[in-house]
Amino acid sequence: MNKTIQTTLQLFLGALILLNISSCQKQEKPVKFIIASDFHAPDIPDGKERLASFIEAAHKEKADFIIELGDFCRLDSASQVYHELWNSFPKDKYHVIGNHDMDQYTPEEYVKGMNMPGRYYSFDKGDFHFIVLDGNNLYDGKEYRHYAKANYYVNPEYRAFIDPEQMEWLKKDLASTNKRCILFSHQSIDTFVKNGKDVRQILENENERAGFKKIVLAFSGHNHSNYSKVINGITYIQINSASYVWIDQPSKTELRYPEEVNKQYPLLGYSITYDRP
């Protein structure tokens, strides 16, 4: 007999997310994690302070793990402070590859430098199965190529694909667990990933095969905006940047920062930083 299950995920979004799901499954134990996206920490004056406040919140909330959804920081010595801050959290920590993480590196270099298990991977926490996807692939109609060292500044129609190998892995990974599943990606599979419809079909097919609402949530970043939507029973949540909104026009940054700061951080010229993360 069906009963209502209350699945609780506590997120660093200024809200407690409660999902009521009809299922025959047992009631899951709560999992608490702190999530952020698009720090762009080396590119803004207070990147260290923003990341520090995130880590402080994770400690205060006694999170089970933390995760960032890409466009985090670089691998050079100047970014060492961000790596040290991130690694100061004593529990599990996870990264997602963002497009700008591929501005100076190959995926192999970045995965190794960030101590990631792979460019896409999965892990379990309590009664939940979490999946990290990688949408940083080019496809010109002939072949798939991963973003690497800024090679993706080409026709926008070629960008943001999930490669076939990853799609097959996703099918097998979903089928291998009976836990409820939550996905993370930099680009949104509901709007931005070019073959997102195919990815969503995999998720929906698995829900149908499993006979219960197995895939419940998919988080993304990249667009520096907030929204949530439901597509065929699966909730998609976009996480805003922890740092700024890109406006793609002069932002009058000279009214907000001194000249030497604007010279050091040219990104400020076309963006508006948030007061706090």
Each predicted region: which residue ranges?
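N-terminal active-site segment of His-dependent metallophosphoesterases
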Residues: 23-81
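Hydrophobic beta-strand anchors of alpha/beta hydrolase catalytic cores
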Residues: 33, 66, 130, 181-182
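Active-site glycine-centered loops adjacent to acidic/histidine catalytic or metal-binding residues
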Residues: 38, 70-71, 98-99, 186, ...
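Short acidic, glycine-rich surface-loop motifs adjacent to enzyme active sites
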Residues: 172-191
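Extended active-site neighborhood of metal-dependent phosphoesterases/phosphodiesterases
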Residues: 78-171, 175-176, 198-215, 225, ...
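Histidine-centered catalytic micro-motifs
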Residues: 183-189, 216-226
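Bacterial Sec-dependent N-terminal signal peptides
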Residues: 1-29, 207-208
